[in-house]
Regions:
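Domain-level detector of nuclease and nuclease-like folds
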Residues: 2-138
Length: 138
């Protein structure tokens, strides 16, 4: 089960950081990765089978940590996670194997995250090596 395993483990790990400092998180879904044209599956409600709801093919989460001097952001680090919507079994901690740069997730989704950061900090944070151990210990 996707939500009860790998996604839940990721959310708990991110929340652990958020309990001790300010972080910014963007979570979303998408049906295609970049320009691909993947089949979209639907679920129909039991009460009205004429209706249907699309099931996302991918889930992503991008997380930003910042350091301040007063009200000025002096440094930033970001990491992204990208998952195909499927069962991941009991290897919940394996979320560390699904990291991506935020730049890559922006490319795949068409979104521009963290636009309020100074450009130089945004560019460095979004292109940083997507290593979970480095990110959580930064």
């Amino acid at each position: 089960d996707f939500n009860g395993s790998i996604w839940n483990a990721l959310e708990e790990a991110v929340q652990a950081i958020g309990r001790r400092e300010e972080i910014y998180i963007v979570t979303g879904v998408t049906f295609n990765k970049g320009n691909e044209n993947k089949e979209i599956k639907y679920v129909k409600p039991k009460k009205d089978a004429s209706q249907k709801c699309p099931i996302p093919n991918y889930f992503y989460k991008v997380v930003l940590r910042v350091k301040h001097s007063g009200n000025t952001v002096t440094d930033a680090r970001a990491i992204g996670f990208w998952f195909e919507h499927k069962a991941y079994g009991t290897k919940a901690k394996d979320f560390e194997n699904y990291t991506e740069t935020v730049d890559k997730i922006e490319e795949w989704t068409g979104f521009d995250f963290f636009i309020n950061l100074p450009d130089k900090l945004e560019a460095a944070a979004e292109s940083a090596s997507p290593n979970w151990s480095e990110f959580k210990n930064w």
